[in-house]
């Protein structure tokens, strides 16, 4: 049983001791008043009060005490029932208390140093400090940005935040325009520039997912991401059995490559060669392909090997079934038939695990019209989040030294990042944040289904730049809430005599209705921060930023030349490959820079 809270029980009733005293004195006054009957005592009650209050102490006569206690109990019951039946009035907010936020509302969430903020609107900013002096003002830096085509997602959100230069950045860059316009600025700020270009492989740095495999768990994550974002063979590709069989086969081959292959062969090219060397014959159950023989030798060497255990499960299927699985695997990895893609993923220059160590800007250039190679981007983001979380936990006590902001423009075109709904809930404490940029909320639901609401719920900030998609408009209007407005009606009755009437009343109205949001001025936006009233503000004016003069928007001389940047990067030299070595003085390097 719960212990009685005497403090809570007694403190509210202390004032009623006064009524015990008061009624006790009344009882004493009546008792001391002269008179043989009640009417006589009432007439001389004044004299009785004089005698009763001659001594300020309460009367301890039993009847006086009883009257005192009874009177106090009566008053307590009257107060109780009056409070219980009291009408609750909320004057001015009867139908809703929604209103637009003010400068005072956002002030506790803003850093006084301009550069230490996330830029949201022209007047609202959010501090990058994840541990403010008052914990109640702490907000994660995950942001959901929604804006239809042409609403300015890049100009009014991505570019202003790149100009802040307070973090490492991972930017999804449709068409590659952000890199061209902001690259020189970031170089000036001391950033390393990394580029993965899935539109033009020749203008990309190398990315090899095998370089980031640290354990068997990483192999499973790589396989799951690959399967989630590629297509197998026809109808069978979507069936659970075939997908599970493919997963076993991929895990076996990648496990073998990771454990047994030389360093220079740990890539997708080797995986394709092993798949091409695999064969299953329905009419010859005893037939063994070169891959079968390879795993047989490995089993003799280590029967408990991860790759062997996976491959033996794969071999449990019949020859005809294995043949179908191999066809599906070939179809799924058909993009790797392109030599440029194989070359791109042969070695690695991305250094994904170091992005949280020093200021780095990684630009992921994707096509906004073709998603053929977006599975590569999905693999990169999956590995990036896992690598950074592991490094924060294992090397930095849970927090990266440099915050990593992922500006995920055209998030719907990236593909599916497995378990993203869990990642976005946990990356905050590691000094990682994600800005999910969409054209409409329905895009998120199309990819992540039931987990879309979980992902959106883990974004403390929502920025709506404009759009006309019905679901988004409805949700925005509902979240803004209702305000209470005054209304009056006039009436006119015509009969023998004309009479007029005027009726005032209060009504509830959405702070902004769906149609009002749909026709919102192109220079306005709606900002919602958890625990704060929404803001109806101007979009950020990029030309007012102190670093705007370093963008190519301001001066074409600031245009970033990706090809020149790639030529300057250190060459990748394979083992035993001859190469030339030169020494360049600092003066020569400065002279070359001046000529540019």
PLM regions and their residue ranges:
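Conserved ATP-driven motor cores of ASCE-family P-loop NTPases powering translocation/secretion/packaging/pilus
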Residues: 424-526
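General secondary-structure edge motif
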Residues: 98, 125, 129, 141-142, ...
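Low-complexity, polar-biased intrinsically disordered regions enriched in Pro/Ser/Thr/Gly
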Residues: 126-132, 231-241, 486-505
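P-loop NTPase motor domains
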Residues: 25, 139-432, 447, 457, ...
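Conserved long hydrophobic alpha-helices within structured protein cores
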Residues: 113-120, 375-383, 476
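A short glycine-/small-residue-rich loop at the edge of a beta-strand within enzyme catalytic domains
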Residues: 107-109, 114, 375, 411, ...
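Basic- and hydrophobic-enriched, low-structure N-terminal and domain-boundary segments
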Residues: 1-151, 155-158, 482, 493, ...
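Short secondary-structure boundary micro-motifs
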Residues: 128, 153-154, 223, 337, ...
């Amino acid at each position: 049983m719960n212990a009685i809270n005497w403090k809570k029980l007694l403190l509210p009733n202390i004032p009623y001791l006064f009524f015990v005293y008061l009624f006790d004195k009344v009882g004493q006054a009546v008792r001391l008043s002269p008179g043989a009957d009640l009417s006589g005592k009432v007439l001389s009650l004044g004299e009785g009060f004089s005698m009763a209050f001659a001594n300020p102490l309460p009367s301890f006569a039993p009847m006086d005490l009883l009257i005192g206690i009874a009177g106090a109990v009566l008053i307590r019951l009257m107060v109780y029932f009056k409070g219980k039946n009291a009408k609750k009035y909320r004057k001015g907010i009867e139908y809703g208390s929604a209103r637009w936020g003010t400068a005072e509302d956002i002030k506790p969430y803003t850093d006084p140093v301009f550069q230490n903020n996330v830029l949201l609107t022209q007047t609202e900013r959010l501090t990058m400090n994840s541990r403010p002096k008052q914990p109640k003002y702490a907000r994660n830096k995950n942001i959901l940005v929604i804006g239809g085509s042409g609403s300015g997602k890049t100009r009014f959100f991505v570019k202003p935040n790149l100009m802040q230069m307070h973090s490492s950045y991972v930017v999804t860059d449709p068409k590659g325009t952000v890199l061209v316009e902001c690259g020189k600025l970031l170089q000036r700020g001391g950033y390393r520039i990394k580029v993965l270009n899935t539109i033009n492989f020749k203008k990309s740095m190398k990315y090899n997912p095998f370089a980031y495999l640290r354990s068997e768990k990483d192999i499973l994550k790589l396989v799951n991401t690959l399967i989630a974002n590629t297509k197998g063979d026809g109808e069978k590709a979507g069936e659970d059995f075939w997908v599970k069989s493919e997963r076993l086969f991929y895990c076996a081959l990648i496990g073998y490559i990771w454990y047994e292959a030389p360093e220079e062969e740990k890539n997708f090219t080797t995986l394709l060669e092993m798949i091409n060397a695999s064969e299953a014959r329905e009419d010859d159950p005893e037939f063994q392909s070169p891959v079968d023989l390879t795993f047989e030798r490995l089993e003799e060497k280590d029967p408990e090997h991860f790759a062997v255990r996976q491959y033996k499960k794969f071999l449990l299927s019949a020859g005809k079934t294995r043949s179908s699985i191999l066809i599906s695997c070939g179809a799924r990895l058909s993009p790797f038939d392109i030599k440029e893609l194989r070359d791109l993923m042969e070695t690695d220059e991305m250094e994904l695990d170091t992005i949280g160590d020093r200021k780095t800007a990684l630009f992921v250039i994707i096509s906004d019209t073709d998603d053929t190679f977006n599975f590569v981007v999905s693999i990169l983001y999956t590995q990036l989040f896992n690598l950074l979380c592991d490094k924060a936990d294992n090397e930095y006590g849970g927090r990266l030294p440099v915050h990593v902001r992922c500006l995920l423009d055209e998030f719907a075109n990236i593909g599916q990042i497995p378990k993203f709904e869990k990642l976005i809930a946990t990356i905050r404490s590691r000094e990682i944040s994600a800005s999910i940029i969409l054209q409409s909320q329905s895009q998120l639901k199309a990819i992540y289904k039931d987990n879309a609401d979980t992902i959106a719920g883990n974004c403390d900030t929502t920025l709506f730049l404009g759009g006309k998609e019905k679901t988004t408009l409805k949700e925005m209007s509902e979240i803004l809430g209702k305000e209470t407005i005054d209304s009056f009606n006039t009436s006119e009755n015509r009969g023998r005599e004309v009479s007029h009437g005027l009726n005032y009343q209060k009504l509830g109205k959405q702070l902004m209705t769906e149609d009002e949001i749909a026709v919102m001025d192109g220079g306005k936006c709606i900002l919602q921060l958890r625990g704060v009233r929404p803001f109806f503000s101007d979009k950020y004016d990029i030309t007012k930023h102190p670093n705007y003069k370093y963008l190519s928007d301001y001066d074409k001389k600031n245009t970033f030349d990706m090809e020149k940047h790639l030529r300057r990067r250190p060459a990748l030299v394979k083992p035993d490959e001859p190469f030339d070595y030169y020494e360049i003085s600092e003066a020569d390097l400065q002279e070359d820079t001046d000529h540019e």
